[in-house]
């Protein structure tokens, strides 16, 4: 305590005329129009008129947004500046006020447009105007609100932030309720509703966070600090937290009708003392301990005030309080004596009258008593009188006065909420409790100071439940707590304290009074937070009503935030048996040590239909329609795997808060349906766990196919097929359905879902090829929300966004050769199976293929399933197709035997023996190509639809093709010249001058020597004394000669010359002349030497015999794959007319020779250069 207090001193932040009105820079806020007055009026409005419509919109205009100018907004800023002693910089201040002014002007236009539209709601121009005004208002608020959260000024700007946030939530609620009538589509309305629910949490958490930051900032050790701390707590509860506590009611789908909320939190006026705020050092903690701890709400019945006397001064020395539980549901109880029961005068009884005490006028007494000098001086801090005024909506009630009326008016700091009526009717708070700050320091001073607690008037006494509204009752209004339940401090956004349990058991009992007919039915909802899954039980007057399982909402050890709480409900309605009933809530089925917090319960009239109810009914109907009967034994045939996934999404999107039990039950049914779908699906790995994982099982595909996880279209994996630059190398995906899985004389169906596609070819192959080319428009046209759907909090797709409903009539079903319009993303193809033969294992091939550059596809949920047994015409048709197939199969076997024999003879002739490890000495490249061509004349080596799938003759084809490969390898080993065919450009060749390697139309690479000074050479290692054959295939254009020379360092030179000859030229070792070239070219299909005899006889079977899979009703013409002859290990195209092959024999004397290519003039074109070692 100060040694020399001066009671006449007015300290800078405090004035004795009102110890709680601070002054900053000489400014004072006009009484009746302060931020507290405005906030109390807004809170009253939100509590009483929280129904969407023009009345609400215009109400906000009348209270704030239509009457505020810069000075009023500045008052909000000044209020907190004073409390935290921090002034906002001029730029930030002007920016905030300018934005608020802009929002105010814009909202007035919005409100007027709303009023006009509501008067004529079908007027197209007014509907369009509302869409424009909403978009403008929403954009302005989205831009402005972050400017009220400027770094370092979050606390001073907090009250205007909350005002703007409240306005934003109200506008978003408007579009959620009226958006469809304004002409917005469902996607936009749902997106804005998602914004609404998200921002309710964001704005709430922001406000509470910075309220707590500011509160911590003003705490200090002395009584002066506590005064400011308490003022900050009280005033920002009124201007921030009370408004934030009502944000959750903006959720229009959860609260579609009038909703009554109650604020049970308490605020405190300072201990009524004169010269209190600056006189006591280190007293802040002691004063705060005088504040009542979290507790159940009770009703103040009476205060018995005792009087003591000191040196002739009477004062309030102590008091006794009696109270009743809410609803007056139990016996009156008394609190322990506060202070001491003085007997200097008879006790004064202040009894509850009317609606409670709404005002106190107190007379603090400070005296310094001089008893002598020095330590004999004594100070007295006491209260020597108070008038208690009672609230009434109708008449003035006589007040009760303890000793005398004072001048310290509680209405100065807790003003009425409605200044249009007398304070007794327009009051905002009533007295709820009184504690006593007592302190004595021997002969130095005596302190006795009552501390008044005040509760908002919305916390009514009787827990009344009417029939026409949603009634929210905080559980701190319970009559009794269950053993193990405690009351804990609320998180700041619940409007009061909350209950807590850490073990299973009864939470509390609540006395409620029903004003509606007892036939009225209700549903109960619970707002809770929990670290564990649990089960809630409810009962009325001991009669069990509801029981349900609910999930954890938060992790252990985390702070309570807006997102920690969830409002859950029971779907089963009930009615009360008595007008006054006891409602009991319990929590069970969880492990002790977890935390369960309960904020409030809600009683909802049963006839109120929520969107969650519609969703539940729709989901129940969708789930039941999956099955053939109510016992869920089998799936309906037309229910696709994709549809089951969409029904699963429908179930997953059900509200946990409203119907968790039903949701879990439906989820189990959908999982059962999915398992049934998997069981009937004959495809292996329909969920695309991998491609090419197993050689003989599952999916096989080209390397450019990608598997992607689920998105907003697909719940499971799907595949993406891209286009290709070469139709002979398509993008493909295929799988074979084993014969063992098929039933004889049965129709099967391939179906699935295509998100989008272009040039996607789909095949089903057995006796014939069922084929469709499918072009499906992308998701932007038939699935409009695919690209617009918002994502979840972890980046997952939001499958709860609205989309087009599944309609089986829109399926793209291609049956019996009918063409498909492809207006749907669903597709299906049928194929009929005749007799089955496990030895033959014909099976069914399922193929997806894209062979164009612009082609693409995304598809999933593929199914191959039994459709129905074949009867009548369909049975006859498949038997006819099967017979035709077998007839052609027999013909193919006869033809194949002949072709195979001839091809094998051609291949065998290339080799010395049956080990196929050495070529004949005279085998040349043309002979190998001729044999390879004969091998490729074997039909049905691969499926014409996809040349990577083996056909009936694959085994014999690959046997002979393997030997051709061996022949090419042995031949390459004999040629000592590297890159002699120029397939690798000029690699290994030395070049002088300008030459080119070009790819001609026949896809062969050739060396072009266009200038006489150019030269191409290569050094080659050889074996001295061995014989070699130099063979060159080339073509000469224009005059002059082309020359290929072989030589050693000295002498031993030979050459082959080529010219565009006009007369026969004979070279010493060359066996071909210009005149006989044409004959040889015609005989062998290319330019070969005279040693190529015997390899061009016509085959014994016509080359164009029809495919054995042909079935006229499905495929017209011959199933021939134009890319079939491109298969194998070498592509061979006969040389154009004009090329000549010449050769010579050469015997080197050293281990190195040089091959040189040049010309004299014109152009010399070289196809290949070979230097072959002769056989010994």
UniProtKB/Swiss-Prot annotation:
Record Pfam families: Cry1Ac_D5, Cry1Ac_dom-VII, Endotoxin_C, Endotoxin_C2, Endotoxin_M, Endotoxin_N
SUPFAM superfamilies with a match to the protein in the record: delta-Endotoxin (insectocide), middle domain (SSF51096), delta-Endotoxin (insectocide), N-terminal domain (SSF56849), Galactose-binding domain-like (SSF49785)
One Gene Ontology term of the molecular function aspect: toxin activity
InterPro entries, per the entry: Cry1Ac-like_dom-VII, Cry_V, Galactose-bd-like_sf, Pest_crys, Pest_crys_Cry1Aa_dom-IV, Pest_crys_dom-III, Pest_crys_dom_I, Pest_crys_N_sf
Keywords on record: Sporulation, Toxin, Virulence
GO biological process: sporulation resulting in formation of a cellular spore; symbiont-mediated killing of host cell
Record's miscellaneous remark: Toxic segment of the protein is located in the N-terminus.
Entry's family note: Belongs to the delta endotoxin family.
Function: Promotes colloidosmotic lysis by binding to the midgut epithelial cells of many lepidopteran larvae.
Annotated protein name in UniProt: Pesticidal crystal protein Cry1Aa
Organism (species): Bacillus thuringiensis subsp. aizawai
Gene that this polypeptide is encoded by: cry1Aa
